[in-house]
Amino acid sequence: MAKLTVKDVELKGKKVLVRVDFNVPIKDGVITNDNRITAALPTIKYILEQGGRAVLFSHLGRVKEEADKAGKSLAPVAKALSEKLGQDVVFPGTTRGAELEAAINELKDGEILLVENTRFEDIDGKKESKNDPELGKYWASLGDGIFVNDAFGTAHRAHASNVGISANVEKAVAGFLLENEIAYIQEAVEAPERPFVAILGGSKVSDKIGVIENLLSKADKVIIGGGMAYTFLKAQGYEIGTSLVEDDKLDLAKELLEKAAGKLILPLDHKVANAFAGYTEVKETADQNIPAGFMGLDVASKTIADYNTQLEGAKTVVWNGPVGVFENPDFQAGTVGLMEAIVKQPGVKSIIGGGDSAAAAINLGYAEKFSWISTGGGASMELLEGKVLPGLAALTEK
């Protein structure tokens, strides 16, 4: 990576500002999934071990007005982080002011403080989300000239707590998580070991147009599954019953199929039901057509067998988006079959691009078998599109 990393700077005795992604799900004051906290630990521990004084910034959810603050405080996160680190985490419960400044100035080497939810600054004029220059400058002034960005999940956004701080410090560097995310995803797309197979699921073609176009020029094959497959199949003249379809994207689907010249792989059969919820009949289709009154909710046995054929010998696999409604046991066989086909390839570098695919791998017990699971859905999508991430671009060059 052509940017400075946390290992390139002297940290001892310095107040080090760190942007982490602690945007975790919280229900009734309890964190229900702490993966993002765990993912930030290597960078935090390194800073503390080097004698740095860590000042952490993170957002949590969306905050538009005063009433939104309820349930959006980072207090439960401070408690969880303290337990994971085995040391106190100072939490002044504010985003600015004399109390915060005093608490930061009182930190000793190896101590840590968490600033309150950065999006509390969005209540008055969206200062965080719109990268208000004064806010970025103020937050930068709380440290000693070093900013570590370890929040890959927000790297595709230009906010005061990443791009704003970066612009006002001597050195803005990448943390270990950000460095790994970029290394795995960008290198897989830009310099893959071949054969390189990309797998795209999810419901809408419109969400993935840029990704499909970029990957068609980079990958050896692009497997399409999930709801967006039905738009491609309808564009080819197949019957799709009551399946999800974007009729306004049929011409685009035809264009992409022509451009792909055989690189786009679509389902050969489907698992269908007579309703999305409350269905009374589930069956497999004989081919790519779906009968009237039925909707496709997963791929079926011929497609799963084809996944094994298409992925045979693959050395790089990037997967973004499930191929069925995996949350329902009736429609998870396709996603399970796909994961089986990926992880059994010898020496394969297998990468999941965050979001629902990551949830599928974790919930269905496959997470440990993949080379890398991204922590950022939106950011990984933009990398797969070949876009420049503002949070990364703002870091200091090596």
Swiss-Prot record:
GO cellular component, one term: cytosol
Protein's UniProt name: Phosphoglycerate kinase
Subunit structure and binding partners: Monomer.
Keyword field: ATP-binding, Cytoplasm, Glycolysis, Kinase, Nucleotide-binding, Transferase
Chief localization: cytoplasm
The enzyme's E.C. designation: 2.7.2.3
PROSITE patterns: PGLYCERATE_KINASE (PS00111)
Reaction catalysed by this enzyme: (2R)-3-phosphoglycerate + ATP = (2R)-3-phospho-glyceroyl phosphate + ADP
Record-level GO BP terms: gluconeogenesis; glycolytic process
InterPro entries tied to this protein: Phosphoglycerate_kinase, Phosphoglycerate_kinase_CS, Phosphoglycerate_kinase_N, Phosphoglycerate_kinase_sf
Gene Ontology molecular function terms on file: ADP binding; ATP binding; phosphoglycerate kinase activity
Organism: Lactococcus lactis subsp. cremoris (strain SK11)
Protein encoded by which gene: pgk
Binding positions (substrate): 21-23, 36, 59-62, 119, 157
PANTHER family noted in UniProt: PHOSPHOGLYCERATE KINASE, PHOSPHOGLYCERATE KINASE 1, CHLOROPLASTIC-RELATED
Localization of this protein: Cytoplasm
